[in-house]
Amino acid sequence: LTVRFRQRLKERLLGNLMVDLEMPLVPVLVSMELAGIGIDGDFFAEMRSKLIRELELIREDIFKLAGGDFNLNSTPQLRQVLFENLNLPIIKKTKTGPSTDGSVLEELAAKGHAVPRLMIDYRELEKLRSTYVDALPQLVHEETGRIHTSFNQTVAATGRLSSSDPNLQNIPIRTEIGREIRKGFVSQAGSV
């Protein structure tokens, strides 16, 4: 089997790439996976409290503007608030009724409607909270006290590395709060 694969690599002029680049990278990736990355648990706990407070303020603002409470995570309830209670224009429809997806909320917000803008903010903060701030501390290995990702050398067709379980290459950077989350990753004492 090895002989056949080597022959295929040579035929495709990939033999040197495999020997000179890909194979030497394997022990480096193994070392990185075993080392893991540290996080500051107190930082994430504080960040969680901050996000919960901000989410609550946004929730209160939405409820005031909407004229009452509703489940912000319920598409049918949001649809009712936006298109029936507030009588906002329907931008696009789905099989079940007017859409409340991100592009619709963006378009409505651009027209000056406050509830769609607040819903965008709410969804963004809620995703950051649930996907990163709440989830990452739960992934700390009991024995090492670090998060251990898997680096995937052969998944992306472009040859780029990818990361999974968790994907540590996907930590947000576009927003201020996204960048703040990155501050929760810490190096070992004496490593910087």
Regions of interest found by a model, annotated:
Residues 183-184:
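Intrinsically disordered, low-complexity, charge-biased tails
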Residues 1-178, 187-191:
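Conserved "right-hand" nucleotidyltransferase catalytic core of DNA-directed polymerases
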